[in-house]
A protein has these predicted regions:
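Short, charged, solvent-exposed linker or helix-capping segments at domain edges/interfaces
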Residues: 55-60
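Non-catalytic interaction-recognition regions
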Residues: 1-54, 65, 72-607
Length: 607
């Protein structure tokens, strides 16, 4: 129609084409769909008939399965990389965001007809030399009764304490008390800055040798590495079990080492990757100095870039545009994260036939993924725009008082604590409201806890920071509750409760006749029906935009309308059931339950 309007102009469109449009919309397959079809200027005004809306709401009510599923993305295969914890480290609060966002994005793609592979990319290789060395070096010094997983975390704490002290430039009087305590227990010879720096150098050198042996396939190192990885994976499963989340594949980055190495070797032979020589570095430095002279770069920016250039000399890099480069192998020939990430692109494309590679990782990795995707294109791993690559990033957890980013050590480093706090909060609030037993209360508390965490993460811009008051988790969970997850769950529970009451009382639901003809919907009923009917479109839109907030906001809209509607429009009155209100309630229950399922939230029997 816009083409006809543009071609003939408004006068011709109004005189010739608009009457034809009005006629088509008033008969044939559209007969009974619209109660009013009129023309005003160049516009056709349509009003859906009450009978058609009631029929359509009935189809929503009777839908078998997850309402809203479609085949809009049936020609696409998504590999979604999310959660991605580090072996030998404790899960921190940020892993909640990655896990929830990635899992629900996967559900959205799946509900829209795509083939989806959910991949937990375990960081099980990079930096593991420190773990292997620490496990042997400090084996006799761990506290009695400390389990294997806590030993791995303790090794990481030792390493970080040593790095902070050695790099801090202060003698013992200026050390953080926690760091000083760790070093006193495990490295008593470290008493001043000089001894700390010497110990750090030895530990790093020994760890590098361990990693080189692991990378070369040394049997003893590989066996210990496998055992320690298994310990970490078992601890991660406790977190995933509590969230009720599973993956199609749990794959360590080590899987991609050989593929990444082969890609780099091929690129060197083809010239798409080069060894970053001092000559190349000097050329880049000259270019940077020219920018400083031209006033387009500050002296501080130059110094930072110059340090990065000096660090990269001797490394294998993929030259990028804008004078940037992507380091894929260290100067000493050792692999790095980038080596394995390049291998992952190739394997995921070949093994899964991926048309889309989605990485759900925090915003601190934006530069890395930008360069990874550009390098993959240069290396021929992306051809004709396929696979599509997307980094879905999210904001930091920040201190509720200072607004500063929380580190793993300072924040809720044990994710189980945050989930347990949410569960306890809701269980306490439900204990005097649910007449059922402890199992029913626990199920409802779990649903509300997960629902509040999910909606808090998804309702707003994913890039926004999330405030955590680590001194008062109850306050944080209370804020999460206000995000709306509990409100949507309440609407679904209320709708299902009304339906159950009709069934339990053996009440009959009167016939609607020919699709509800003769019943006049009020404006709120018509709006509710429209929102229910457009839910499938919102699911697809959320999937296409890789933005769960599109669906979450629509769910909140439906819940808001229904919670207002049922309080004024009784479904049951004097043992008589209003059939239209009953069907709208059925449709609401089905739609919200389905949408909540996509958001990984179960609807409890009562709250």
């Amino acid at each position: 129609m816009p083409g006809l309007l543009k071609k003939g102009g408004p006068k011709v469109f109004i005189a010739e084409h608009l009457p034809q449009l009005i006629r088509v919309l008033s008969e044939g397959e559209f007969d009974g769909v619209f109660s009013e079809v009129t023309a005003t200027g160049i516009y056709a005004n349509l009003r859906l008939s009450d009978a058609w809306l009631i029929q359509a709401a009935g189809r929503v009510a009777d839908f078998d399965g997850v309402y809203g599923t479609q085949n809009a993305l049936s020609d696409r295969a998504f590999v979604v990389d999310y959660s991605s914890p580090n072996v030998a480290k404790r899960l921190h609060a940020g892993h909640i965001r990655s896990t929830i966002i990635g899992h629900i994005l996967s559900n959205l793609y799946d509900a829209s007809g795509a083939t989806v592979y959910r991949v937990n990319h375990i960081n099980d290789f990079g930096g593991f030399g420190y773990t292997l060395q620490g496990y042997r070096q400090f084996a006799g010094q761990f506290p009695a009764g400390m389990n294997e997983n806590d030993r791995l975390i303790e090794i990481y704490q030792i390493r970080r304490a040593l790095e902070r002290v050695a790099g801090g430039g202060q003698d013992a009087a200026g050390w953080d008390p926690a760091d000083a305590s760790v070093l006193q227990r495990y490295l008593p010879e470290v008493t001043d800055l000089a001894s700390a720096q010497a110990a750090a150098a030895r530990f790093t050198a020994d760890s590098d040798q361990r990693f080189a042996a692991l990378e070369a396939g040394d049997e003893e190192e590989v066996r210990l590495w496998q055992d320690l990885v298994a310990v970490s994976l078992a601890s991660f499963d406790e977190f995933y079990d509590q969230l009720g989340i599973s993956f199609d594949f749990v794959l360590g980055e080590s899987l991609y080492l050989q593929a990444g190495t082969e890609v780099v070797e091929r690129a060197l032979a083809e010239g798409t990757a080069v060894v970053y020589t001092q000559e190349l570095a000097d050329g880049d430095l000259a270019g940077l100095r020219a920018q400083v002279d031209a006033g387009t770069m500050s002296a501080q920016e130059y110094e930072s870039a110059a340090r990065a250039i000096a660090k990269d000399v001797g490394a294998t890099v993929v030259p990028l545009d804008k004078g940037e480069r992507y380091v894929v192998v260290r100067a000493d020939g050792r692999s790095i994260y980038a080596t394995r990430d390049i291998g992952a692109v190739e394997i995921r494309t070949d093994l899964f036939g991926a048309t889309d590679l989605v990485y759900v990782v925090g915003q601190e990795q934006r530069v890395h993924f930008d360069r990874l995707f550009r390098a993959a294109g240069r290396l021929g791993l992306i051809e004709d725009g396929l696979p599509r690559t997307l980094h879905v990033y999210f904001g930091f957890y920040v201190d509720a008082t200072s607004g500063k980013k929380l580190s793993s050590r300072d924040s809720v480093s044990n994710v189980m604590g945050l989930l347990a706090a949410a569960f306890d909060y809701f269980r306490a609030s439900l204990s005097d409201r649910i007449s059922g037993g402890e199992d029913e209360i626990a199920a409802a508390a779990r649903s509300l806890a997960v629902g509040s965490l999910v909606f808090n993460d998804l309702k707003k811009d994913l890039r926004s920071a999330v405030e955590i008051d680590s001194r008062d988790l109850q306050r944080t969970i209370s804020e999460f509750e206000r995000s709306g997850g509990a409100y949507v769950i309440y609407a679904a529970v209320r709708a299902r409760s009304i339906l159950r009451r009709v069934s339990d009382r053996g009440l009959s639901v009167g016939s609607l006749g020919s699709g509800g003809s003769g019943y006049e919907l009020d404006d709120q009923e018509a709006l509710l029906a429209l929102r229910l009917l457009t839910l499938p479109d919102q699911i697809v839109a959320a999937a296409q935009q890789s933005n769960p907030a599109v669906l979450v906001r629509h769910m909140l809209d439906i819940a808001n309308i229904y919670n207002s509607y049922y309080s004024r429009a009784a479904v049951i009155a004097d043992d008589s059931v209003n059939p239209v209100r009953y069907r709208l309630t059925q449709a609401t229950a089905n739609a919200l339950t389905s949408a909540l399922e996509i958001c990984h939230i179960e609807v409890p029997a009562a709250i």
